[in-house]
Amino acid sequence: MAKLLQFNEEALKSILKGVKTLAKAVKVTLGPKGRNVVINKGFGSPLSTKDGVTVAKEVVLKDKFENMGAQLVNQVAAKTSDVAGDGTTTAIVLAEAIYSAGVKNVAAGANPMSLKRGIDQAVETITRSLDHLSTPVNTAQEVRQIATISANNDGEIGRIIGEAMERVGKDGIITVAEAKGIETHVDYVEGMQFDKGYVSPYFITNAEQMSVELSNADILITDKKLSAAKDIIPVLEKIMEKGARPLLIIAEDIDGEALATLVVNKLKAGMTVCAVKAPGFGDRRKAMLQDIAILTGGKVVSEEVGLKLDEVGPEVLGRAKTIKVSKEETTIIDGAGQSNEVKSRLAQIKAELANASTSKYDKEKLEERLAKMVGGVAVVNVGAATETELKEKKARVEDALHATRAAVAQGIVPGGGVALLRAVKSLEKLQLTGDEAIGVTIIKQAAFAPAIAIANNCGKQGNLIAEKIYEATGSYGYDGLTDEFKDLLKAGVIDPVLVTKSALINAASIAGLLLTTAAMITDKPQPKSQPAGMPGMDGMGGMGMGGMGGMGGMGMM
């Protein structure tokens, strides 16, 4: 297939056009008075959103060279969203500002590689300064303020997320789901819960709620599949000798004679027992069984560690104060595990989370395990009157949740673009020369871009507002919602420092990459082929009626 090529200045200009088009679509959403963007995906109802990364993902340009620039900057939004969960619009605004200034300087004769070195050093200096500016999140009020701002100044969402985080703790997990009604509410789950219910309804103890409820129960945990009666009878006899406590059995699977034996003991011998399948699959199942064992003070009966069901007794059992089992899930509350062992297990899971090589999917599963271990799970059920409103509101809740987690993890800085304009003053210490010094100047100018965009969206002269913020000190800045200059930290206009740092780092990284581009290659568009006519149609032109003249001699005899 033939290719199209562009080189040097021509390539940089095509990229710039694509970057500017993308930024124009995204920039309008920034700040407290940012506008929504309506997206028609070609199916279902249109989506109205104020989420930068959602808008950026939908931008695909007709010109292939321009589209390459747009898609590369699109990665800025995606990466920032992955790391910090918010700040995607800020990242794109910064990327446009850095790249635009860089292209002008390259056109004027600056060396792109030297510019990039200066840009990288400037970004490193600013991120260190942002760390010094940040303050830890100390109060529930600050958590609510962060959530409110990230949810487009929706106080209800801020309150809900603030209360949820206060309830489940910083290690607890908060998930977002769609409610069946129009009200937004939070459901809390106490203890360790996993998505496996009873394997037989004969185990039910509460007929009204169709559930199994066990108090002060023993727990037998094994990774073995239980099918034959001989798999279960020896250990049951040893447990019964100890005393008739309620018993929960967690195994890979339970069926056949083994299940029948348990049901008969429940119905005829009056034994309070319930069996559930082990959660997860493969190595994750083994890890979760070990989590349950540590939390309840028991051991996983596994031949891998030299334990066989027919040889063990009550010493391998875990214990919990309350166990609730429904058709679809099991909840273990107040396990009897040793606190030092539980803390050690939590530290191990956190270490795996901190490992850079851990995939995003694995991190999500590790976070779930961490939350289950500490017994804190909250589900925010988002309600709305229409499907379009529901999608938009759910996206805002997810933004707010991510931003709040980032703030709790690393602290907060003044919002409204103020933090960058304070941190940029640290660049005065950098003693660079030539084109590297120009790279530093590019970052200094780009630091004004978020504050300018916020003020412009509020109907103000962005350049004047940003200059006034730069000349001030501390947390003094422009509150676009009230149209006032004030101490933004006290006013609750705050950003997680991780969001601000991630936006700058990712924007500078991709802009520097684009500046050093010397050639672009893409497929040449193929002309659309015309639909072919029916074969033989052209040859039918001679079949006029005159061709049938010879039939005149075929009169009736």
Curated annotation (Swiss-Prot):
Where found?
A: Cytoplasm
- Under which name does UniProt file this protein? Chaperonin GroEL 1
Q: List S-S links within the chain.
A: none
Catalyzed reactions per annotation: ATP + H2O + a folded polypeptide = ADP + phosphate + an unfolded polypeptide
**UniProt KW Transmembrane helix keyword:** no
- Which gene underlies this protein? groEL1
Which GO biological process annotations does it have? Answer: protein refolding
Give a yes or no for keyword ATP-binding in this entry: yes
The UniProt entry, under NCBIfam families, shows: GroEL (TIGR02348), PRK00013.1 (NF000592), PRK12849.1 (NF009487), PRK12850.1 (NF009488), PRK12851.1 (NF009489)
What is this enzyme's EC? 5.6.1.7
Single GO molecular-function term?
Answer: isomerase activity
Matching Gene3D superfamilies: GroEL, GroEL-like equatorial domain, TCP-1-like chaperonin intermediate domain
Q: Which family is this sequence assigned to?
A: Belongs to the chaperonin (HSP60) family.
**Coarse class of the protein's main subcellular location:** cytoplasm
Subunit structure of this entry?
Forms a cylinder of 14 subunits composed of two heptameric rings stacked back-to-back. Interacts with the co-chaperonin GroES.
Binding sites annotated in the UniProt record for ATP? T29, L30, G31, P32, K50, D86, G87, T88, T89, T90, G416, D495
**A GO-annotated cellular component:** cytoplasm
**What functional role does this protein have?**
Together with its co-chaperonin GroES, plays an essential role in assisting protein folding. The GroEL-GroES system forms a nano-cage that allows encapsulation of the non-native substrate proteins and provides a physical environment optimized to promote and accelerate protein folding.
Pfam families, A to Z: Cpn60_TCP1 (PF00118)
Keywords in UniProt for this one? ATP-binding, Chaperone, Cytoplasm, Isomerase, Nucleotide-binding
